[in-house]
């Protein structure tokens, strides 16, 4: 798919050198949604490719590539679907994973589940149960930085906790992507 006015995405992150926290992110990106013709091409690509694989890993960054139709096809045609629908400085406020249903495995961080559920007060565990029911997610993992991760299995209605090995986060940029690739296997 060729999308006009779409140069290579440029992301500049400004970090606090003392704690490696991102202070500011400046993004140069064309995150407009695909045209109807482009979406049709992309959906045809998905129809042909997704059924060929035992595992489909989707990282939806909310930059306009995956339409509701595309997400529906991915969910319908995947034998096993692992999803990460991130909230970042370029998409906060309008990006959601609501287009995805019947997902085998989802990994998001604590801020992302709070954003998704529009809830900053309830426990992570109760939000996990609600999101799993709402989206029909079999296994939901929420990362919490140095507090470790919380894992929820919908079938057994069971919560498990996994402590973090690192007590100090050295570089958390990309940590969710790395966790997704490991958990999806």
Give residue spans per PLM region.
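Short internal beta-strands
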Residues: 1, 81-85, 106-110
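Conserved N-terminal subdomain of the carbohydrate kinase-like
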Residues: 1-55, 77
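Short, ordered loop/turn segments at secondary-structure junctions
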Residues: 3-5, 61, 86-87, 111
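Short gly/pro/ser/thr-enriched loop/turn and capping motifs at secondary-structure boundaries
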Residues: 6-9, 88-91, 113-115
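Non-cysteine beta-strand/loop elements that form the S-adenosyl-L-methionine
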Residues: 15, 102-111
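Active-site donor-binding loop signature of nucleotide-sugar glycosyltransferases
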Residues: 28, 108, 162-164
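Conserved phosphate-binding/catalytic region of the ribokinase-like
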Residues: 33, 52, 59, 66-102, ...
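Well-ordered alpha-helical segments embedded in enzymatic catalytic cores
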Residues: 41-45, 112, 127
């Amino acid at each position: 798919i060729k999308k006009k006015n779409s140069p290579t995405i440029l992301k500049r992150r400004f970090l606090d050198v003392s704690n490696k926290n991102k202070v500011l992110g400046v993004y140069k990106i064309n995150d407009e949604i695909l045209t109807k013709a482009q979406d049709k091409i992309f959906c045809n690509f998905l129809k042909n490719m997704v059924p060929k694989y035992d595992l489909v890993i989707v990282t939806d960054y909310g930059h306009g590539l995956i339409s509701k139709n595309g997400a529906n096809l991915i969910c319908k045609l995947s034998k096993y679907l692992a999803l990460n629908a991130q909230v970042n400085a370029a998409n906060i406020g309008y990006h959601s994973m609501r287009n995805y249903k019947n997902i085998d495995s989802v990994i998001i961080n604590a801020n992302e589940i709070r954003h998704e559920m529009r809830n900053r007060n309830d426990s992570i565990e109760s939000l996990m149960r609600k999101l799993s029911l709402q989206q029909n997610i079999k296994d939901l993992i929420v990362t919490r930085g140095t507090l470790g991760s919380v894992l929820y299995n919908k079938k057994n209605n069971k919560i498990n906790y996994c402590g973090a090995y690192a007590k100090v986060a050295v570089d958390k940029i990309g940590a969710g992507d790395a966790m997704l690739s490991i958990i999806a296997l």
